[in-house]
Amino acid sequence: MKKLKNKFNNSYLMINMIKNKINISSDNEIIEKNVYSLVGIDLIGNRDFLGFYIDKNNDNRFFLNLFETLKSKGINKIYYFIANDDGKLKRALNISYPSTIIITNLTMNIASLWYHISYRSRNDLISKLKKLYVQDNYDNAYILECCLKEDFNDNALVLLLLDKYFSNIEDYYQYDVDVRNFLFNHNSFTDFYDKIKSVSKERMFNDENDLYKEFNDYIEAMEKNRLYDKKKWSNILNHCSKYFPNLLEEVANIL
């Protein structure tokens, strides 16, 4: 089995935090806990699995300890951090990586709606929600948003959740469409979320090592396969450099 790296890259253009619930065996009891899986994309476009982190004790310092662990393993800069909306996480991230921009995790927000819509409607909903973030301009996105709400006009709870989790779409239209496509590449991470969710229904875990053994083959395959070819990655870097003036210089220093 491949071992998790002791040292990671100095900088990551993006780190995506994927939240799942798993069953933990503790003192002859089965306890449901949150596990956070971190996947990073470095400055040359390679993916790194950065570890499983189980919040075993609902500790107020959990996220702060997590970011301290990342720092101890060599990660000094994160440009974008993709995560669910959590006040404790945001505060800890601001302490450890104050210049990092936190972006709503589309996978997590979509998952919040799954229990309230039919199975057949899910793929259609995923497609429409992704499109909200990657239109050429916000006017087009607003039209799509209105159409989406009309689709669920008879489901008051879904409408409330759409307002709760997708009310800040306009904020992201400060970014170019290529950057938004990169930040909201939902499909690149939803497979990992679904895989953990599926396996967790069938078995318990004792700790992070158990998780790593279970998903080792998947992680190895994920790290080997790039999401973007070199030309596409260069375009992403060029667009992101508009918001981070020193980004291209940092990339040049490691090539």
Question: Where do the PLM segments sit?
Answer:
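Alpha-helical elements of the RecA-like P-loop NTPase motor core of helicases
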Residues: 61, 87-91, 160
